C-alpha cells in the first residue's frame, strides 16, 4: 500500500490520502505523540474511520519498533558491566531493569463507538489496511456472545448475565471451562480480525465461550473495540477488567457523548421495585425458615444468613416508608428536589458510604440464589435486587470529598408511578400485596397512598469524562461527522483539548445541492413549530412539496420528520386526502418501524425497491435508527428532505432541568452554552446526523432540502455542519419553490451526465449496497468483471455476514479491491479468493479459511478442502495443505503440566522481563514490579508479598516455567521456601 510521511510517522494508506484525510491524520498523530486530547470533526464520507485507524496504528507500530530497539540497547548496556557479581547482584540488576522497563510500555488503542454495527464497520475498514495483521479484539455482551443454550433461553440481558455468572461460579458451563486450555488455539489467536459474528463461529467450532475467550485476547491486543458503555461506565469497566492506564481512547461517533456520559451517571428506582424486593426477601426468609433451601440448593453453604436477610428487609421497609412520605406537589409533571435529597432518603434506611459495598455484595448473592431457585419453582429471578444494586452503586460512586460538585450537577425528580392494572388505593394495594401484604409497612400503616418513581439525574457530562481521565489514559480523541460547535462541547466535557479540527467535505461543490425551502408549491409557509404543526394547510403543502421532489429525484429519497407523532399525523392526513397515493405512484413509500424485526424486513424491502427504476421514498424520524446509523450511498439516497427541527419536548422535566443547570453554571470563563442555545443545538445536531446519511464517498452526489423556514435564522445556520454552511452562503434565504424545482432537475441532469456511475457491484444485492464503504473513493477501485454465477457464489458465502442492522458498515472488501489498493495490476479475471488470502502472509495459516489452493482451482475445490479439514485429518495432502496438517496437530495438543515444565525461562534479565510482560496483564506486571522493588531492600514480609503475587500470576501450568525461572533472582535465604511452595503446586 502507498506510504505517506505524516507528522514524521510513515503511514500506510490504501490510496494516496486526500488533503482532508492528511490533515485529520496529522491531528491524530500530534495527540498520540504529545499525550494530549483532541476533538476532531470530519464529515461523513471523508474517510474519517479509515484515517483514524491508519494514523493511530501507524504511530503504535512506530513506537513498538522504537521500544524493541530500546530494549536491545538496554540489554547490551546491562550485560556489558556484568562480571561475577556478588550474591543478590542478579536481583539488583533485575530490579533496575524492571524500573526502566515499566516506563517504556507501548500504549494500546481502545476504539469505542455507540453500537456494535459501527464497531463492525470499523473492523471491516481495518481489514483492508496494511495494519490488518496487528492484534485486535472486540468486546461484546453475553447477549451477543454466549453460546450456552440454557443461558440463551433466558429473557433479557440482566437474566442472561446473572445466569452466566451462576454457571461460571458453579462450574457448570463447559464452554467457559474450556477457555483456559484452548485460549491459544490458532483459530483464536490467528492474524484474522474477528468481529462479533466471527467470535461466535470460532467459539461454536472450538466449543469454547466467545465471551470469556475475547477477554483473554485483550492483554495482548494492540487495539480493542468496544461499545461506549464498557468504557464510560465504571461498573462495566470493573466487570470487564478494562485497564486504561497508558491507553489511547478513541470515541468515534461522539456527537452524543454528552448524553451518554450523563445517562451513565443517572439512575431510576420505583416504589414497585422496592415493594417487589421486599417480597423477594420475605420469600427467601420463608424458604430458609421452612428448610426448603437445602432442597433448592443442595448441600452448598449459603453466602448469606437469615440475619443478613432480616437486616436487609428492615432497611428496605424503611426505604419504602421514606419514599411513601415524599410529597409530590404536581402529579402530572412531578416534583424536583436537590441532589442531597437522595442521600437523605437512603440515609433514612441506613444506606451509607460505610455499608454500601456490603449491601451491594449481598444483593448480588441474592440474585444468584434466586436464579438457582427459579429453576425449581415459579418465582422472580432477582431483577429488583439488580436495580437496587445499580442504584446504590451509582449514587455512591462519587467520593464524599466531591459532594459539593455532586449537589451542583445532579437533581432528584419524583414522578407519580401509574398503576399497570388500574387506578386508586385498592388497586395499588392489590398490586403490592399478595401473600406479602401483611408484612409491609404500607399495608400496616396505610402510608402508601401513591406509588412513585425516583429519578437521580446527572446534568454534567464532565463527571464521566473526569473519571475516564483519572484512569491515567494517554490520550482521548473525540471524533464524529457532527461535533460542531466545538467550544461548548469541550466546555461541557471539561477536558483539556490541544488539538481540534473542523474538516471540509471531500466532495466538490457541484456534487451537492443545498437549499432552504420556506414555502410549498401553494406558497404556504413551511414551518414545523408548535403553533403550526396541526395546521391542515401546512401538512398539505408539505405533502405537495414531497410529491414534486419525488418526481424529480432519481432512485432513493429520504424524508426525516421531527418526531414519530408528527410523522404519523402527516401520514394520516395524506392518506385521507389522496396525496399518499399520488406519492406512491411516483415511488413506493416505506415508513420507519420501531420494532427491530419489522425494521430489518422494511429495510430489505426498501433496498429491493431501489433496484426498480422508480426508486423509493423512506420516511423516518430524526434521532431514529435510520438517521443515526444507516448508509444510503449512491442510488440508495440521492436526496434528503428535512421537514422540521427536532427540538426536545419543551416541557419535559429533564429538558427543563438541563436548561436550568446550564444557566446556573454558565460563566464567561467556562464558555458553556445558555439553556436556549443548548436547546437549539440539540435539534440541529440531530439534523446534521440525518443529513449525513447521503454523500457517503468522494464520487457520491445528492440534494439536501431543508423544508422549514427557520433554517434561514442565523442561530440555526451557525449550528449546521461547516461544509453545509459553505453551500448556503453567508446570508442564506428561503428560495421560491418554482426556481428550486428547475435547479433541482438541472442538478441531477448534470450529475448523471458528468459523475461516474456507481460500481456495478453495488447493485448486485440490496444488502451489499448498504455495506459499501463511505470512505474509499470509487476512482481507486477498478471495475471487476464478474464471471457467470459469481454473484450467486458471493452472496451464498457472505449471506450470514451481511445484516441490515449493520447497514452502515462497508461493503465486503474483495481480492480485486485489495490488489488495486496495493498497486497490483489485475488481469481480465478477478483473482482467486483463496490465492488472495495466501498473499497476506505466506507464513501464517492458522484459521481454516486461510488454507490456500492453486489459483486454477475453483470453488468446488475450496469446499472439498473445508470438508477434509473438519472431518478427515488423514486425507491426502497437497502442498498447500501441509500447513493445515500442522495446524490440526496444534489444535489437538492438550495442555499438560509437563509441556510447560519442559520450557525454560530466558536467562537474560531483559528477555525474561519481555516474556513476562507478554504473558501477564499490565496490572499484574505493575504489581510484580512494585513487589520486586520492595523485596530488593525489604524484609521477610516483602518476600511473602512477592511470593503471593508470583503464585497468583505464574502458577498456571502454561506459565509455571517463568515462576521457576524467578528462583535465580531471589535471596539465598528464601530459595528453600520458594522451592517448597513451588513444589506443592
From Swiss-Prot:
Keywords: 4Fe-4S, ATP-binding, Chromosome, DNA damage, DNA repair, DNA-binding, Helicase, Hydrolase, Iron, Iron-sulfur, Isomerase, Metal-binding, Nucleotide-binding, Nucleus, Phosphoprotein. Residues 863-883 are annotated as: Disordered. SUPFAM superfamilies: P-loop containing nucleoside triphosphate hydrolases (SSF52540). [4Fe-4S] cluster binds at residues 146, 164, 173, 209. Its EC number is 5.6.2.-. Gene3D superfamilies: 1.20.1160.20, P-loop containing nucleotide triphosphate hydrolases. Disruption phenotype: In males, RNAi-mediated knockdown in germ cells results in loss of male germline stem cells (GSCs) at day 14, appearance of branched fusomes and down regulation of a number of genes including Stat92E expression in adult testes. In females, RNAi-mediated knockdown in germ cells results in a decrease in germline stem cells in the germaria. RNAi-mediated knockdown in somatic cells or in differentiating spermatogonia does not affect GSC number in larval and adult testes or female germaria. Residues 7-303 form the Helicase ATP-binding domain. Changing residue 95 to T: In strain: ZW141. Transmembrane segments: none annotated. Its main location: nucleus. A probable ATP-dependent DNA helicase implicated in DNA repair and the maintenance of genomic stability. Acts as an anti-recombinase to counteract toxic recombination and limit crossover during meiosis. Regulates meiotic recombination and crossover homeostasis by physically dissociating strand invasion events and thereby promotes noncrossover repair by meiotic synthesis dependent strand annealing (SDSA) as well as disassembly of D loop recombination intermediates. This is Regulator of telomere elongation helicase 1 homolog.
